[in-house]
Protein backbone atom coordinates (compact mmCIF):
# COMPACT_ATOMS: atom_id res chain seq x y z
CA UNK A 1 0.00 0.00 0.00
CA UNK A 2 1.32 3.42 -0.97
CA UNK A 3 2.08 5.84 1.83
CA UNK A 4 -0.27 8.73 2.46
CA UNK A 5 1.32 11.86 0.88
CA UNK A 6 1.37 13.73 4.19
CA UNK A 7 3.01 10.79 5.95
CA UNK A 8 5.59 10.59 3.16
CA UNK A 9 6.44 14.28 3.62
CA UNK A 10 6.80 13.73 7.38
CA UNK A 11 9.21 10.84 6.82
CA UNK A 12 11.26 12.94 4.40
CA UNK A 13 11.53 15.69 7.01
CA UNK A 14 12.56 13.20 9.69
CA UNK A 15 15.24 11.72 7.44
CA UNK A 16 16.73 15.13 6.68
CA UNK A 17 16.75 15.99 10.38
CA UNK A 18 18.69 12.81 11.08
CA UNK A 19 21.22 13.49 8.30
CA UNK A 20 21.79 17.05 9.45
CA UNK A 21 22.31 15.90 13.03
CA UNK A 22 24.78 13.18 12.01
CA UNK A 23 26.80 15.00 9.36
CA UNK A 24 26.46 18.76 9.68
CA UNK A 25 26.31 19.43 13.41
CA UNK A 26 24.00 22.39 12.86
CA UNK A 27 20.81 23.29 14.64
CA UNK A 28 17.70 23.22 12.48
CA UNK A 29 15.66 26.40 12.48
CA UNK A 30 12.96 25.08 10.17
CA UNK A 31 12.37 21.88 8.20
CA UNK A 32 9.65 21.18 5.65
CA UNK A 33 8.92 17.83 4.05
CA UNK A 34 7.96 17.82 0.37
CA UNK A 35 6.73 15.22 -2.10
CA UNK A 36 10.24 14.88 -3.51
CA UNK A 37 12.27 15.25 -0.31
CA UNK A 38 12.74 17.91 2.36
CA UNK A 39 14.20 21.38 2.90
CA UNK A 40 15.83 22.72 6.07
CA UNK A 41 17.05 26.14 7.14
CA UNK A 42 20.05 25.70 9.43
CA UNK A 43 22.00 27.89 11.81
CA UNK A 44 25.08 29.68 10.54
CA UNK A 45 23.54 30.77 7.20
CA UNK A 46 23.47 27.21 5.94
CA UNK A 47 20.76 25.26 4.16
CA UNK A 48 20.14 21.54 3.60
CA UNK A 49 17.99 19.66 1.13
CA UNK A 50 17.02 16.01 0.79
CA UNK A 51 16.27 14.56 -2.66
CA UNK A 52 14.27 11.34 -2.53
CA UNK A 53 12.39 11.53 -5.84
CA UNK A 54 13.50 12.99 -9.18
CA UNK A 55 16.90 13.47 -7.61
CA UNK A 56 18.59 14.88 -10.72
CA UNK A 57 16.17 17.84 -10.58
CA UNK A 58 16.87 18.76 -6.95
CA UNK A 59 19.55 21.42 -7.41
CA UNK A 60 17.31 24.27 -8.56
CA UNK A 61 14.79 23.92 -5.75
CA UNK A 62 17.54 23.65 -3.15
CA UNK A 63 19.30 26.79 -4.40
CA UNK A 64 16.06 28.76 -4.74
CA UNK A 65 15.07 27.90 -1.17
CA UNK A 66 18.57 28.73 0.07
CA UNK A 67 18.33 32.15 -1.58
CA UNK A 68 15.07 32.84 0.25
CA UNK A 69 16.78 31.88 3.52
CA UNK A 70 19.82 34.09 2.76
CA UNK A 71 22.04 31.01 3.13
CA UNK A 72 25.54 31.07 1.67
CA UNK A 73 26.26 27.34 2.02
CA UNK A 74 24.06 24.53 0.73
CA UNK A 75 24.16 20.78 1.40
CA UNK A 76 22.20 18.42 -0.85
CA UNK A 77 21.63 14.82 0.29
CA UNK A 78 20.51 12.38 -2.41
CA UNK A 79 20.35 8.65 -2.97
CA UNK A 80 20.52 8.85 -6.76
CA UNK A 81 21.96 11.02 -9.56
CA UNK A 82 24.61 12.45 -7.24
CA UNK A 83 27.06 12.63 -10.15
CA UNK A 84 24.65 14.92 -12.01
CA UNK A 85 24.08 17.05 -8.91
CA UNK A 86 27.81 17.31 -8.14
CA UNK A 87 28.57 18.31 -11.72
CA UNK A 88 25.94 21.04 -11.65
CA UNK A 89 26.99 22.24 -8.20
CA UNK A 90 30.42 23.17 -9.56
CA UNK A 91 28.81 25.58 -12.04
CA UNK A 92 27.47 27.88 -9.30
CA UNK A 93 29.25 30.52 -7.27
CA UNK A 94 27.29 29.44 -4.19
CA UNK A 95 29.07 26.87 -2.01
CA UNK A 96 27.21 23.60 -2.64
CA UNK A 97 28.20 20.19 -1.26
CA UNK A 98 26.48 17.05 -2.55
CA UNK A 99 26.18 13.98 -0.33
CA UNK A 100 25.40 10.46 -1.55
CA UNK A 101 23.09 8.59 0.83
CA UNK A 102 23.14 4.79 0.90
CA UNK A 103 21.35 2.89 3.64
CA UNK A 104 21.28 5.93 5.88
CA UNK A 105 25.03 6.54 5.49
CA UNK A 106 26.09 9.74 3.73
CA UNK A 107 29.41 10.21 1.94
CA UNK A 108 30.74 13.04 -0.14
CA UNK A 109 29.61 12.55 -3.74
CA UNK A 110 32.26 11.47 -6.21
CA UNK A 111 33.82 14.04 -8.51
CA UNK A 112 31.45 14.62 -11.41
CA UNK A 113 32.08 12.55 -14.51
CA UNK A 114 31.96 14.19 -17.94
CA UNK A 115 28.87 13.38 -19.95
CA UNK A 116 29.42 11.24 -23.02
CA UNK A 117 26.75 10.76 -25.65
CA UNK A 118 25.94 7.31 -26.95
CA UNK A 119 26.55 7.14 -30.71
CA UNK A 120 23.51 6.94 -32.95
CA UNK A 121 23.02 3.86 -35.15
CA UNK A 122 24.21 4.13 -38.75
CA UNK A 123 20.90 3.79 -40.60
CA UNK A 124 20.94 6.43 -43.37
CA UNK A 125 18.05 4.86 -45.32
CA UNK A 126 15.72 5.00 -42.32
CA UNK A 127 16.78 8.57 -41.56
CA UNK A 128 16.02 9.49 -45.18
CA UNK A 129 12.55 7.98 -44.81
CA UNK A 130 11.86 10.24 -41.84
CA UNK A 131 13.18 13.29 -43.69
CA UNK A 132 11.30 12.50 -46.90
CA UNK A 133 8.11 12.21 -44.83
CA UNK A 134 8.53 15.83 -43.76
CA UNK A 135 9.56 15.07 -40.19
CA UNK A 136 12.12 16.96 -38.12
CA UNK A 137 14.84 14.40 -37.42
CA UNK A 138 16.26 14.72 -33.90
CA UNK A 139 19.04 12.61 -32.41
CA UNK A 140 19.53 12.50 -28.64
CA UNK A 141 21.85 10.12 -26.79
CA UNK A 142 21.83 7.54 -29.57
CA UNK A 143 18.07 7.69 -30.17
CA UNK A 144 16.80 8.93 -33.55
CA UNK A 145 13.22 10.21 -33.74
CA UNK A 146 11.06 12.04 -36.23
CA UNK A 147 9.04 14.94 -34.84
CA UNK A 148 6.16 17.12 -36.01
CA UNK A 149 6.25 20.58 -34.47
CA UNK A 150 8.41 19.19 -31.67
CA UNK A 151 6.34 16.08 -30.91
CA UNK A 152 7.71 12.62 -31.66
CA UNK A 153 5.65 10.61 -34.15
CA UNK A 154 8.22 8.01 -35.21
CA UNK A 155 11.35 6.40 -33.80
CA UNK A 156 14.13 4.32 -35.31
CA UNK A 157 14.54 1.06 -33.40
CA UNK A 158 17.65 -1.09 -33.74
CA UNK A 159 17.56 -4.36 -31.81
CA UNK A 160 17.78 -8.12 -32.24
CA UNK A 161 14.71 -8.00 -34.47
CA UNK A 162 16.46 -5.69 -36.91
CA UNK A 163 16.45 -2.01 -37.86
CA UNK A 164 13.05 -0.41 -38.40
CA UNK A 165 10.85 2.63 -37.92
CA UNK A 166 8.09 2.40 -35.33
CA UNK A 167 5.26 4.91 -35.66
CA UNK A 168 3.34 6.55 -32.83
CA UNK A 169 3.47 9.21 -30.13
CA UNK A 170 5.47 7.51 -27.38
CA UNK A 171 6.15 3.86 -26.59
CA UNK A 172 2.57 2.82 -25.75
CA UNK A 173 1.17 4.48 -28.86
CA UNK A 174 3.81 2.80 -31.02
CA UNK A 175 2.84 -0.60 -29.63
CA UNK A 176 -0.87 0.05 -30.13
CA UNK A 177 -0.35 1.35 -33.66
CA UNK A 178 1.70 -1.72 -34.58
CA UNK A 179 -1.07 -4.03 -33.31
CA UNK A 180 -3.81 -2.20 -35.19
CA UNK A 181 -1.96 -1.21 -38.35
CA UNK A 182 1.01 -3.55 -38.49
CA UNK A 183 0.63 -4.18 -42.22
CA UNK A 184 0.43 -0.52 -43.21
CA UNK A 185 3.45 0.71 -45.23
CA UNK A 186 5.81 2.79 -43.10
CA UNK A 187 5.51 5.98 -45.15
CA UNK A 188 1.71 5.79 -45.09
CA UNK A 189 1.73 5.13 -41.35
CA UNK A 190 3.98 8.14 -40.70
CA UNK A 191 1.73 10.35 -42.81
CA UNK A 192 -1.39 9.24 -40.95
CA UNK A 193 0.02 9.95 -37.49
CA UNK A 194 1.82 13.13 -38.56
CA UNK A 195 -1.37 14.60 -40.01
CA UNK A 196 -3.23 14.02 -36.74
CA UNK A 197 -0.46 15.72 -34.76
CA UNK A 198 -0.26 18.68 -37.18
CA UNK A 199 -4.02 19.18 -36.87
CA UNK A 200 -3.82 19.49 -33.10
CA UNK A 201 -0.53 21.41 -32.91
CA UNK A 202 -1.83 24.62 -34.43
CA UNK A 203 -2.76 27.88 -32.66
CA UNK A 204 -6.47 27.50 -33.43
CA UNK A 205 -6.73 23.89 -32.23
CA UNK A 206 -8.94 22.99 -29.29
CA UNK A 207 -7.14 21.86 -26.10
CA UNK A 208 -5.91 18.30 -26.56
CA UNK A 209 -3.16 16.08 -25.12
CA UNK A 210 -1.28 16.38 -28.42
CA UNK A 211 -0.91 20.14 -28.00
CA UNK A 212 -0.04 19.94 -24.32
CA UNK A 213 2.78 17.42 -24.63
CA UNK A 214 6.28 18.69 -25.26
CA UNK A 215 5.53 22.42 -25.28
CA UNK A 216 9.22 23.19 -24.80
CA UNK A 217 10.06 21.18 -27.93
CA UNK A 218 7.30 22.97 -29.83
CA UNK A 219 8.95 26.26 -28.89
CA UNK A 220 12.32 24.91 -29.98
CA UNK A 221 10.92 23.88 -33.36
CA UNK A 222 9.78 27.48 -33.91
CA UNK A 223 13.25 28.79 -33.06
CA UNK A 224 14.97 26.26 -35.33
CA UNK A 225 12.85 27.60 -38.18
CA UNK A 226 13.13 31.25 -37.11
CA UNK A 227 16.40 31.73 -35.18
CA UNK A 228 16.32 35.47 -35.85
CA UNK A 229 13.60 35.81 -33.21
CA UNK A 230 16.34 35.50 -30.57
CA UNK A 231 19.18 37.07 -32.53
CA UNK A 232 20.63 33.84 -33.90
CA UNK A 233 21.64 33.12 -37.48
CA UNK A 234 21.43 29.33 -37.25
CA UNK A 235 20.18 26.80 -34.73
CA UNK A 236 20.06 23.02 -34.73
CA UNK A 237 18.42 20.65 -32.25
CA UNK A 238 20.90 19.36 -29.68
CA UNK A 239 20.71 16.64 -27.01
CA UNK A 240 20.06 17.44 -23.34
CA UNK A 241 22.75 16.67 -20.75
CA UNK A 242 20.60 13.86 -19.32
CA UNK A 243 18.56 11.59 -21.56
CA UNK A 244 14.77 11.93 -21.44
CA UNK A 245 13.10 8.83 -20.05
CA UNK A 246 9.59 9.36 -21.40
CA UNK A 247 7.54 11.62 -23.63
CA UNK A 248 5.26 12.91 -20.87
CA UNK A 249 8.02 14.40 -18.73
CA UNK A 250 8.58 18.10 -19.38
CA UNK A 251 12.32 18.39 -20.03
CA UNK A 252 13.82 21.64 -21.39
CA UNK A 253 14.65 21.43 -25.10
CA UNK A 254 18.17 22.27 -26.25
CA UNK A 255 19.56 23.78 -29.44
CA UNK A 256 23.00 24.95 -30.52
CA UNK A 257 24.23 27.27 -33.23
CA UNK A 258 25.49 30.77 -33.85
CA UNK A 259 24.33 34.28 -33.01
CA UNK A 260 24.17 36.98 -35.67
CA UNK A 261 27.69 38.10 -34.75
CA UNK A 262 29.06 34.58 -35.21
CA UNK A 263 29.36 33.76 -31.50
CA UNK A 264 28.59 30.14 -30.61
CA UNK A 265 25.40 29.76 -28.59
CA UNK A 266 23.58 27.05 -26.65
CA UNK A 267 19.84 27.70 -26.34
CA UNK A 268 17.62 26.04 -23.74
CA UNK A 269 13.83 26.36 -24.14
CA UNK A 270 11.24 25.83 -21.44
CA UNK A 271 7.53 26.51 -20.96
CA UNK A 272 6.20 26.91 -17.42
CA UNK A 273 8.04 27.81 -14.23
CA UNK A 274 10.78 25.25 -13.63
CA UNK A 275 13.10 25.84 -10.67
CA UNK A 276 15.64 23.41 -12.11
CA UNK A 277 15.82 25.16 -15.49
CA UNK A 278 18.99 27.12 -14.73
CA UNK A 279 21.04 24.15 -13.40
CA UNK A 280 19.83 22.10 -16.37
CA UNK A 281 20.74 24.85 -18.84
CA UNK A 282 24.21 25.32 -17.37
CA UNK A 283 24.76 21.56 -17.57
CA UNK A 284 23.63 21.59 -21.21
CA UNK A 285 26.24 24.21 -22.06
CA UNK A 286 28.92 22.25 -20.21
CA UNK A 287 27.94 19.16 -22.21
CA UNK A 288 27.78 20.81 -25.65
CA UNK A 289 30.20 23.75 -25.60
CA UNK A 290 31.48 25.20 -22.30
CA UNK A 291 32.73 28.36 -24.05
CA UNK A 292 29.44 29.17 -25.78
CA UNK A 293 27.01 31.90 -24.82
CA UNK A 294 24.06 30.39 -22.95
CA UNK A 295 20.53 31.61 -23.69
CA UNK A 296 17.51 30.52 -21.67
CA UNK A 297 14.32 31.15 -23.65
CA UNK A 298 10.96 31.20 -21.87
CA UNK A 299 7.53 32.81 -22.36
CA UNK A 300 7.22 36.20 -20.68
CA UNK A 301 4.68 34.93 -18.13
CA UNK A 302 7.19 32.33 -16.92
CA UNK A 303 10.04 34.82 -16.41
CA UNK A 304 9.74 34.74 -12.61
CA UNK A 305 12.23 36.72 -10.55
CA UNK A 306 13.59 33.51 -8.97
CA UNK A 307 14.79 32.46 -12.42
CA UNK A 308 16.93 35.58 -12.69
CA UNK A 309 18.17 35.11 -9.12
CA UNK A 310 19.31 31.57 -9.91
CA UNK A 311 20.85 32.68 -13.21
CA UNK A 312 22.95 35.26 -11.37
CA UNK A 313 24.29 32.53 -9.07
CA UNK A 314 26.04 30.81 -11.99
CA UNK A 315 29.77 31.43 -12.39
CA UNK A 316 29.04 32.22 -16.05
CA UNK A 317 25.48 33.60 -16.06
CA UNK A 318 23.18 33.03 -19.05
CA UNK A 319 21.09 35.46 -21.03
CA UNK A 320 17.47 35.01 -19.97
CA UNK A 321 15.33 35.79 -23.01
CA UNK A 322 11.57 36.18 -22.42
CA UNK A 323 9.52 35.78 -25.60
CA UNK A 324 5.92 36.50 -26.56
CA UNK A 325 3.41 34.46 -24.56
CA UNK A 326 1.60 33.86 -27.87
CA UNK A 327 4.61 32.06 -29.37
CA UNK A 328 2.38 29.19 -30.50
CA UNK A 329 0.87 31.61 -33.02
CA UNK A 330 4.18 32.43 -34.67
CA UNK A 331 4.26 31.84 -38.41
CA UNK A 332 7.13 31.66 -40.88
CA UNK A 333 5.64 34.31 -43.16
Task: Identify what each model region corresponds to.
Residues 1-333:
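Charged, terminal alpha-helix-loop-beta segments
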